[in-house]
């Protein structure tokens, strides 16, 4: 949505200073062992914002050692009441509310995110996620089991231990809290590696974590690159679990490293090529808008993007016309500027990849309805692009684009569209638009997706589990299921003289 459509959004901060640029270990700020730093940029202007300490294997080792020490039996963190963990998470949410404007401005400057979206959606989601996780802290519990014989048996839900958490660049702060919220609620300690493109809000969170009162070593933040710092976390022999959100290609490397090291637990939220199916009986206005937001939100840089749009033949032409009309309404520019409705892609690498895929669509015979190229003289901007007459064998129909590119395909029958929708390596999410409840239930059951939305799209909440089928990953984040990823179940059996019912 455009900034002008959003109510109650203050102006972003000006002359923002980036105070926290070092590595956060044991509630203290450290320079990198190597002495190296790396630059952080504004993708809208291509200007350097600051330099950040570049963590690598030696820094990860220090962070893991601190996390392990904080997790020792008898430590302040391990002996803390579960309800107190919840209080600390709520305190952290309070501090995010206090720094709401600063963090939203930082997300827009560093991540190219529309300021209004950062302020309302991302920061709002961050606060709700933490409060949800805080509420679970003293409700993660075991059971008693009526085992045969004279025994008393019960289970304990114990924290996994030291958790490595590798964060993507598209939702830097929200994904940071999706990771640390459940982990800390369950009593784990964490070593977090933010994406090298967007480390600034994560590092600011280090200061808030210390201010909230978390003991030293419970949360450690090591900015750095994937092949060095990320690889060190994935292969570390003293990391008990790693959680990663990002590309399927990197997810495979992380799982391989986990298997070759200590068989640490792994949860992965990876890529997607999500189908969105619009039947002829759907509310067309609703379907057009949700499908549009489903692929163009945050410049298309969403793992759940509705990037394969299947429209029933009888309404296809009208749907394409309305979709093109909607895409042409975008105003591109600096995401901090009021009235702008589309910002830049995150960096040059993504920018060039998207433009290459757009060119492939043109060459392979898709009809370019609008957009189709770069925009402006500075920054990584790409025109909102709509293709029609797309076929399933085209690259734009198969590969994850991660950009503002909508491809619209035609279908004739229910059985045909189910088969085509499932014909992908991915299985993260899907959408269905129909006013026929029988059709909605039938199709949602048939789709191989971790999440299916009916007559809506991209509706995500802390109360609901999120994750993918197939090569979109494994494990779940958030909801009650998400906490299982951060606990181990221990069975305790005690011999007693006599058991009574």
UniProtKB/Swiss-Prot annotation:
Question: What subcellular locations does the record give?
Answer: Cytoplasm, Cytosol; Cell projection, Axon
Q: Which residues form the active site?
A: 269, 303
The chain residues annotated with the modification N-acetylserine are 2
Residues recorded as bearing Phosphothreonine in the entry: 337
Query: Which reaction equations make up its catalytic activity?
Result: an aldehyde + NAD(+) + H2O = a carboxylate + NADH + 2 H(+); all-trans-retinal + NAD(+) + H2O = all-trans-retinoate + NADH + 2 H(+); 9-cis-retinal + NAD(+) + H2O = 9-cis-retinoate + NADH + 2 H(+); 11-cis-retinal + NAD(+) + H2O = 11-cis-retinoate + NADH + 2 H(+)
Site (Transition state stabilizer): give the residues.
Answer: 170
- Keyword Lipid metabolism (UniProt): yes
- Annotated NAD(+) binding sites: 167-170, 193-196, 226-227, 246-247, 269-271, 349-353, 400-402
One GO term in the molecular function aspect is: aldehyde dehydrogenase (NAD+) activity
Ranges where the record places region Mediates interaction with PRMT3: 336-501
Q: In which tissues is it expressed?
A: Expressed in muscle, liver, small intestine, kidney, brain, lung, heart but not detected in erythrocytes (at protein level).
User: GO CC terms on record?
Assistant: axon; cytosol; synapse
Q: Write down the InterPro entries for this protein, in alphabetical order.
A: Ald_DH/histidinol_DH, Ald_DH_C, Ald_DH_CS_CYS, Ald_DH_CS_GLU, Ald_DH_N, Aldehyde_DH_dom
Q: Which PANTHER family match?
A: ALDEHYDE DEHYDROGENASE-RELATED
Stated family: Belongs to the aldehyde dehydrogenase family.
Q: What protein does this entry describe?
A: Aldehyde dehydrogenase 1A1
Q: Which organism is it from?
A: Bos taurus (Bovine)
Gene that this sequence comes from: ALDH1A1
């Amino acid at each position: 949505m455009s900034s002008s459509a959003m109510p109650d959004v203050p102006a972003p901060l000006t002359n923002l200073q980036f105070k926290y640029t070092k590595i956060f270990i044991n509630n203290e700020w450290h320079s990198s062992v190597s002495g190296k730093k790396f630059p952080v940029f504004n993708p809208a202007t291509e200007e350097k914002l600051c330099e950040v300490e570049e963590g690598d294997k030696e820094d990860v080792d220090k962070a893991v050692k601190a996390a392990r020490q904080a997790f020792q039996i008898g430590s302040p963190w391990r002996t803390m009441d579960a309800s107190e963990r919840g209080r600390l998470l709520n305190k952290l949410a309070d501090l995010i509310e206090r720094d709401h404007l600063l963090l939203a401005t930082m997300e827009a400057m560093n991540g190219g995110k529309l300021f209004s979206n950062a302020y309302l959606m991302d920061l709002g989601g961050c606060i709700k996620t933490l409060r949800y996780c805080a509420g679970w802290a003293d409700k993660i519990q075991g059971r008693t089991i009526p085992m045969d014989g004279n025994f008393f048996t019960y289970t304990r839900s114990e924290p996994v231990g030291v958790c490595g958490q590798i964060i993507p660049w598209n939702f830097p702060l929200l994904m940071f809290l999706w990771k640390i919220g459940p982990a800390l609620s369950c009593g784990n300690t964490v070593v977090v590696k933010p994406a090298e493109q967007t480390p600034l809000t994560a590092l600011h969170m280090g200061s808030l974590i210390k201010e909230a009162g978390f003991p030293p070593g419970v949360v450690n933040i090591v900015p750095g690159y994937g092949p060095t710092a990320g690889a060190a976390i994935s292969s570390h022999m003293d990391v008990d679990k790693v959680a990663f959100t990002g590309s399927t290609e990197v997810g495979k490397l992380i799982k391989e490293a986990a298997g070759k090291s200590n068989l640490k637990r792994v949860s992965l939220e990876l890529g997607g090529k999500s189908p969105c199916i619009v039947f002829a009986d759907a509310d067309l206005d609703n379907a057009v808008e949700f499908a549009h937001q489903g692929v163009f939100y945050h410049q298309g840089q969403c793992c759940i993007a509705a990037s394969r749009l299947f429209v029933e033949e009888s309404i296809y032409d009208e749907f394409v016309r309305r979709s093109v009309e909607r895409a042409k309404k975008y105003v591109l520019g600096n995401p901090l500027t009021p009235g702008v409705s589309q910002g830049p892609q995150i960096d040059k690498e993504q920018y060039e990849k998207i433009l290459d895929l757009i060119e492939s669509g043109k060459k392979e015979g898709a009809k370019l309805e609008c957009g189709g190229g770069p925009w402006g003289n500075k920054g990584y901007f790409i025109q909102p692009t709509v293709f029609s007459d797309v076929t399933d064998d085209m690259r734009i129909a198969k590969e994850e684009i991660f950009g503002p590119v909508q491809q619209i395909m035609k279908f004739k029958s229910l059985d045909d569209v189910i088969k085509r929708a499932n014909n992908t390596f991915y299985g993260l999410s899907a959408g269905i638009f129909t006013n026929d409840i029988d059709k909605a239930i039938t199709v949602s059951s048939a789709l191989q997706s971790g999440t299916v939305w009916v007559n809506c799209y991209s509706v995500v909440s802390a109360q609901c589990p999120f994750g993918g089928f197939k090569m979109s990953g494994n494990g779940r984040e958030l909801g009650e299921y998400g906490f299982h990823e951060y606990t181990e179940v221990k069975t305790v059996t005690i011999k007693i003289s006599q058991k009574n019912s």
